[in-house]
Structure formats: structure tokens, C-alpha cells
Amino acid sequence: MYKYAILTFLILTSCSKENLEFKVPTTSEVEKLIKHSDEFNQEVITFDTPGGKIHFAIGFGIANSIMVEGQDGNIIIDAADSRYDAEKIYELFRKKNSNPVKAIIYTHNHGDHTFGAAYYLDIQDYKPQIIAHEDTDYYVQRIIGILNPIITQRSARMFGTFLPEEELINVGIGPRLNVSKSPNGYVKPDLTFSDELKITISGIEIELYHAPGETNDQIFVWLPKHKSLMPGDNIYKTFPNLYTIRGTTHRDVTGWIESLDLMKSFYPEYLFPSHTRPVIGKNEINNIFITYRDAIQYIHDQTIRLMNAGYYPDEISEMIELPQNLSSSPFLYEFYGTVRWSVKSIFNGYLGWFNGNPAELDPLSRKEKAKRISKLAGGENELIKELRLAVDKEDMQWALELSDYLISLDLFNSEVKTLRQKALIHEGAKSSNPNKRNYFLSSALELNDEFELTNLMNIDDTFLNNLSIDTLFNVLSVRFKPEDHDGSLYKVCFNFSSGLVRSISLRNGVAVISNEAQNNCDLEVLTQEIELKRVLTGLKNPVSSISSGEIVVQGGNTEFLKFLAIFR
């Protein structure tokens, strides 16, 4: 990977996991989670619906993939998390029906639903239509662009991507994430819509509806003749992820409820979720919709009630529990989202990060607070003794908090690291919520000295052709290190062979991006979009691109390399 790359898919992972000592105790708390893995037994199930055959692939990656048979072609709903999984799934789909794929429908932007699409373009001459909500590509570009480093790292922890295989039970809504097993296969949609779209493809009547919920671009698919509904990620057999610990924009809980009510109004006889198994039967599906939406409304309404009573989010999260008649539903076991995290997210969504406590508006810095806690404990040595005592007593959450103070004091020695690792393993091992379990165990594994940075996701030109050049310029903006620039106005202009122009002006500590032609450029760069993408993603060394003439710099090749080096 070249040092000039600004878009890389990096996480902490191990080059030799098998050489690491990592023992996780078996606890009774995870028995339900182990049983939950039965939900993801790998298979393709065929359903003879009133409108025709629907094939349902489950257990290959996190998300399910669905194939609907048409008259002279088939439709894929959600394309799996990788070309690797898409190939395995389609080998089985093709045995059911070998007609070409006429269309791929993305229910939303998440990679486990979109990153396998390119496989279908690779295997047939006919290019399938890619259908999605009009905002789907925006969210894909955002995640793989400016937020890529932190979302990639936190997602890898949450999904247990680099845990030893024997320690990954499941990820709550699927068996595992396989995104690293092949180059990213995202393909931009070429047919989008805002609120609803009714279309007939290969004789199949399809109705698509915008249904904000787990994502803002979420849609659901209604096949009226099949009496079948595909809800995407708005319902699955676990408590909904009203907030995800990998990080996300605020999820509109009231919009999610409204979307569930809309789906319920169709009275489907077949429900094919994008995670967990299908549900058959109008009455059962109707009851599940009621239970699910009522649980979400309960959490929302009670959070608002207690917010208005003056409680803080951490207090509210301890006060609210689902009524027993709701919490006993298998669709509301906390195998993905939790009530506690949801409460805090709802509070933040309405009131923002400040909880209302004046002591927490401008608190002491982490380091200053750690110094004072250390002083209260009797000094740094006494603080370490308290950490040892907490671990001995298996008071592990307190141990984690104590180790935070020691880290802030730059006292993260081998003993503190070992004690923190024990606390993380203990807390993770006893959690029946896979998001928490995987995040804690992954964080513990990262503390091994053998860990180093490596790529999670492979990329190639197919991916780059679907990556907007503006995504890369936006990444440059947020990777600019002003301390590495002298502060003077400096303008670099890019002229692409397609006729597209972009410029970056460095001024006042920011990198200002423009899509208009500029005068008085310090550097002018002439190239193709794909070539700059290769350089900025590390597929090519800019020195070789300049030497070959694929990048021409007016104003100095060395100056251009220096310019690239200030984006980190």
C-alpha cells in the first residue's frame, strides 16, 4: 500500500491469529445466543407463492439474498455482502432457475446487501438493472469515503471480523461478515425513486416503497401477485438496532414505526426479511408487526416521558424495560439492538449530546480527571492496586473504567494491558448480545502485540468505476493536516480527460473543493478519473503514474507529491 493512499480499508487485525493465546471461557449467559445460530443454518429455501416461485438464501453471510422467478428472467433482492458470497448463493439459485438476472434491488445502502452486485455483472452479457432509493448511493459513498477508517474499524469489532473462528458465535442477524473475501462489488443504482415505484420486470409486478427505519434510504418490496413482502432491515428476529454501536446517523424511530405500520397494511402472507428466516401466514405476520412496532413505540414514548421529567440518559436507560408480554417475544430478544442503547440514542436524537447536567457541559479533560482520581486513590500505585482488586473480584466494568484512567496517565504498561484484557474478555464472554460480545472480545484481541494494520476490503477497477470522484475529493478535505502546510493560499487544479474539472484550494487551515474551472493554479494535474482513483486508493504509486505519463503535472512533479503527502 503506497504512502500517498488516502482511502484505504484498514482495521486492526492479526497476521497470525493461530499463534495468539486467546482463551474465552464458556458461560451460561450465551446459551441462548448459541441456540440462535440455528436461525442461520445455510440453505436455499424455495416457496411456491400464489404469484410464482421465490428462492430464499440464508446463512451465507450476514444478509439474506432473495431470487424471484420471472417469465424470462429473475430478480435478485439484496446482492449479499461480497462477490464471494454472491457466487456461492447464485450457484444454488441457478440450479433452481438458470434464466438471466434482469434486475437487482437494493433494500438499502449497507454493504452486506450491496457489495456482491458486481458478481452478477461479471457472469452474464446482459447488464441487470440496479434499483434502489435515490439516497442509497449517497450513503454508500459516505461510508466508503469520509467515514471509512472509523466505521471500518468499529464494524470489524462489532461483527467480530478478526476473532478466532471458534469464538465467533454469530453476529445476531447472520452468521458472519464475509466482505474481506473478495473485492468490493458495489454497483451504482441506475434506476432510483423517491417515495414509491411500481414497475413490471419479466412479468413480475413489483411495488417499491420508501420506508425509513434502520436506514434513511430503506425501502420495502411488495409483490402483490405473490402476496409477499420483503421488509429489508426494518424487521428481523431480534430486538431492532435502533442504535448501532459501530456508529451511524440518528435513526428516526417514529419513522420506523410508521414504516412498520405501512408494511402491516398490506397484510402479506409471506414475509421475507433480509436477516433471519421467512415467516409464513397472514395472522402470524400481522401479530409480529404489531409486537415489533409496539415495542419500538414503547421505548420511544417512555424515553420521551422520562426526558421531560428531567432524567439523564444513563438514568433512563436503567429505568426502562419492555413489558413482559413484549420482551418474551422471540422477535425482541436482544441479539442485535438493546433497550439500553436505544434509549440513549433517542435522547441524543431529540436533544443532542448535552444531557442537561451543568457538570458535564465542559467537564475536566480525561487526563486531568484521571490525575484527580489517582490522587483520591492515594497515587498511581494505589490506583493500579485498585485495578488488580477489581479484576480479582470480577468487578470488570469498574476495572475497565479504572484502566481508562491509567491509560490517560500514560501508565498503560504490560500489567495494566493484561488486566484490561482480562476485563474485556470477561465482560464479552458473559454477554448474550453478539454486538457487545464481539466488540469486547475484539478489543481484547487488539491488545496482543502481534496485531498490525492490514486491509479489510479488497478493491479493483470495477469498484473504482462505481466510486464517485467527488467521494475521493471529500476524503481529501477531511484528511488535510493543516500543521503540515505553511498556511499560504495554494491551489491545485485537476483537469480530467472526461472534461470534468475539480480544484483544491488550501487556505485558513481547510481544503476547499470546487467543481468549477479556476485561474492562477499553483499546480495543474491532467489525468483520467480512474488513474487518480488508483493513486488515491493505493492501487498505484503516483511516481509510476507520473513516469508513464498517465498523470501529467504542470508546476512540478515533486511539488505534487509533497501536496499529496499532507493528506493523512
Residue ranges of predicted features:
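Metallo-beta-lactamase
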Residues: 74-75, 81-83, 141-210, 255-267, ...
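Feature captures hydrophobic
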Residues: 389, 395-401, 405-408, 412-568
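C-terminal motif of bacterial Sec signal peptides marking the signal peptidase cleavage site
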Residues: 12-14
